[in-house]
């Protein structure tokens, strides 16, 4: 019986080893499945993180572009803030210049003209401080960006496409034309 008992014990031991091996294999399989599941979750979270980082970079770039655009618009607004009032003042300046061309024939008229010249100078200086300047025309080559041709002439003293006469002064505010010069151009 001892042999039988030994065989039974050996069988039980073998069964126990098989069960333990099976349990170890099952445990290892569970660990592998759990490891794969965790790795999949990590990969998914890394992809989500990368997507969010890219979105954040785009939002930051959009915000920087918005700030730059706002700054440029503000600078342009400051630069040309006086354009409307200057445009409204130009006809008055033209009238002043026409009035100053009248010849004074007595002391009262001369005195009045001197006063008007002082006011005219002050007005021109105030406009210069704002960046307004007259556009040079006579003797210059015709430039459609600066001049408006209203007449043509044939004058041998001037070359082709040269401004011969200025009918109305043109003005620029900083680098922007607010009124082109009305000119007569040589053919």
UniProtKB/Swiss-Prot annotation:
Keywords: Chaperone, Cytoplasm, Stress response. It is found in: Cytoplasm. GO terms for cellular component: cytoplasm. InterPro entries: GrpE, GrpE_coiled_coil, GrpE_head. GO terms for molecular function: adenyl-nucleotide exchange factor activity; protein homodimerization activity; protein-folding chaperone binding; unfolded protein binding. PROSITE patterns: GRPE. The keyword Nucleotidyltransferase does not apply. It holds the Pfam family GrpE. Residues 1-38 are annotated as: Disordered. The keyword Ubl conjugation does not apply. GO terms for biological process: protein folding. Homodimer. Participates actively in the response to hyperosmotic and heat shock by preventing the aggregation of stress-denatured proteins, in association with DnaK and GrpE. It is the nucleotide exchange factor for DnaK and may function as a thermosensor. Unfolded proteins bind initially to DnaJ; upon interaction with the DnaJ-bound protein, DnaK hydrolyzes its bound ATP, resulting in the formation of a stable complex. GrpE releases ADP from DnaK; ATP binding to DnaK triggers the release of the substrate protein, thus completing the reaction cycle. HAMAP family: GrpE (MF_01151). Belongs to the GrpE family. This is Protein GrpE. It comes from Bacillus subtilis (strain 168). The gene is grpE.
């Amino acid at each position: 019986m001892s042999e039988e008992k030994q065989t039974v014990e050996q069988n039980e031991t073998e069964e126990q080893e098989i069960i333990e091996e099976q349990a170890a294999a099952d445990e290892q399989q569970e660990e592998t499945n759990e490891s794969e599941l965790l790795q999949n979750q990590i990969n998914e979270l890394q992809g989500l993180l990368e997507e969010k980082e890219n979105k954040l970079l785009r939002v930051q770039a959009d915000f920087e572009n918005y700030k730059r655009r706002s700054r440029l618009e503000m600078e342009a607004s400051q630069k040309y803030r006086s354009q409307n009032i200057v445009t409204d003042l130009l006809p008055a300046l033209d009238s002043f210049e026409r009035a100053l061309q009248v010849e004074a024939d007595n002391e009262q008229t001369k005195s009045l003209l001197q006063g008007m010249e002082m006011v005219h100078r002050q007005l021109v200086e105030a406009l210069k401080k704002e960046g307004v300047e007259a556009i040079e025309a006579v003797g210059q080559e015709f430039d459609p960006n600066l001049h408006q041709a209203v007449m043509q002439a044939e004058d041998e003293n001037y070359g082709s496409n040269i401004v011969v006469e200025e009918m109305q002064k043109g003005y620029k505010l900083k680098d922007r034309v607010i009124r082109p010069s009305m000119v007569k151009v040589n053919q």
